[in-house]
Curated annotation (Swiss-Prot):
This is UPF0200 protein VNG_2452C. It holds the Pfam family AAA_17. InterPro entries: NTP_hydrolase-rel (IPR022970), P-loop_NTPase (IPR027417). The lineage of its organism: Archaea, Methanobacteriati, Methanobacteriota, Stenosarchaea group, Halobacteria. It comes from Halobacterium salinarum (strain ATCC 700922 / JCM 11081 / NRC-1) (Halobacterium halobium). ATP binds at G8, M9, P10, G11, S12, G13, K14, S15. Signal peptide: none annotated. Belongs to the UPF0200 family.
Length: 190
């Protein structure tokens, strides 16, 4: 059993890493999907209310609320798969929740890219929530407020996403294929 979590600032490549995992047949739990479902359950448009509902869930149920809501989904995936990727961890409390639940079978991967590159990627992609008018600075500040920097500091592995898309895909595939969950992967695959 392996549970691989990704952490990183907006536009770093977390969703792209999840796509690589999904293409390899690995179940992916997108923590943002938990929030989007909560928006719908509250009769709100996820594209317009994602950030506010993410904060509301944490205010109402504690800083680990989204991770706790994710655990049964992950455990369900693990009945049929040996590896699950959790996309989009936002706080050290969420990291602790997953480490408590899965112990040494949990690996946290920091997907890293410089701010200007991330900003350009966000501007180029067409994803709900990216165009809701929230500037990148505000979004980063909100995520830092959740404990993003502390979560990043807890990462077991870092993948630097500054090269080509193919190189990044190779790095993610190397991590997914590693014999041990905490195997360091090279930052560059030239």
């Amino acid at each position: 059993m392996r549970v691989i979590g990704t952490v990183g600032m907006p536009g770093s490549g977390k969703s792209e890493a999840a796509t690589v995992a999904a293409n390899a047949g690995i179940p992916v739990l997108v923590m943002g999907d938990v929030i989007r479902q909560e928006c719908r359950d509250r009769g709100l448009d996820p594209a317009q209310h994602h950030g506010r509902i993410a904060q509301a869930l944490r205010d109402e149920h504690g800083p680990g609320a989204i991770a706790h809501q994710s655990l049964p989904i992950i455990e369900d995936h693990l009945t049929d798969a040996t590896t699950v990727l959790v996309d989009g961890i936002r706080s050290d409390v969420e990291v602790t929740t997953f480490r408590d639940a899965f112990g040494d079978d949990f690996t946290l991967v920091h997907v890293s890219a410089p701010r200007e590159l991330r900003k350009a990627r966000i501007e180029d992609r067409d994803r709900p929530g990216d165009t809701d008018g929230e500037p990148l600075d505000a979004r980063e500040d909100r995520e830092r407020g959740f404990g993003m920097d502390d979560a990043i500091d807890l990462a077991d592995v870092r993948i630097e996403n500054t090269d080509s898309l193919d190189a990044f895909h190779d790095a993610v595939r190397d991590l997914l294929a590693a014999d041990t969950p905490h195997t360091e992967v090279p930052d560059n695959h030239d």
